[in-house]
């Protein structure tokens, strides 16, 4: 995905692989449908912060998805 690769290069960070892209898109869907739509990009941002601090992406996504699926 040239767009995401270009952004990653400009930010000086590692790009996303297909598994990471799929996990983040699934996260955005689950958050948007399980809470409010506006929470999807914000939750993705928080996952990025957690990953930047050393948490595994799948673990961070799992934590956030758990909140999205239990929100009433």
Functional labels for PLM-detected ranges:
Residues 4-7, 16, 26, 55-72:
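C-terminal binding/interaction regions
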Residues 13:
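Long, contiguous binding/interaction regions
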Residues 16-52:
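Amphipathic, hydrophobic secondary-structure cores in small proteins
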């Amino acid at each position: 995905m040239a767009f995401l690769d270009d952004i990653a290069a400009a930010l000086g960070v590692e790009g996303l692989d297909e598994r990471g892209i799929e996990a983040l898109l699934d996260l955005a869907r689950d958050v948007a449908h399980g809470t409010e739509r506006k929470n999807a990009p914000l939750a993705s941002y928080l996952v990025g912060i957690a990953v930047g601090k050393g948490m595994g992406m799948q673990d961070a996504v799992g934590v956030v998805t758990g909140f999205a699926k239990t929100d009433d």
